[in-house]
Amino acid sequence: MEVKVFRFDATKLILSKLDNQPIVANLGPTSDELWHAEHRDRNFYTYGNMGLCSSIALGMSLSSDEKIISLDGDGSLLMNLGTLATINRENPKNLIVLVYDNEMWGQTGRQATHTSTGTELVEVAQGCGIEKTELVDDLESLSEVFDK
């Protein structure tokens, strides 16, 4: 796998686009990097709940009018794919789910995830009915998509 965007750089870019909106960060390195990029009282670090980052963000989005950002990982999302179907059913207009896909379960020993062998999470999300999906692999594209 060729690394085109480092998660830390992407996280810093996302933070630069936000005011004080809540961010829910996946466990492990994603939470660590969010902390180091900019620790804020409204960051929610999800240690100890692998697979639930986007589910927590969904619940927050349904109970608030604020924009809620989920910084999830491919391994975490693969552990709870039902979240995508539920996000489609609930259809929150204030939820943004970003999935960092490094093709591995980094928190449990760097085992390869299904995305390393062809599972396309954008297509899975679309199959669940989520129409507004984007695949980005550079910071410029991430910035453009985030501004939409």
Where would I find each of the regions flagged by the language model?
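Long, non-catalytic terminal segments
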Residues: 1-6
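Thiamine diphosphate
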Residues: 7-12, 17, 33-148
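N-terminal glycine-rich anion-binding loops that anchor highly charged ligand groups
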Residues: 21-35
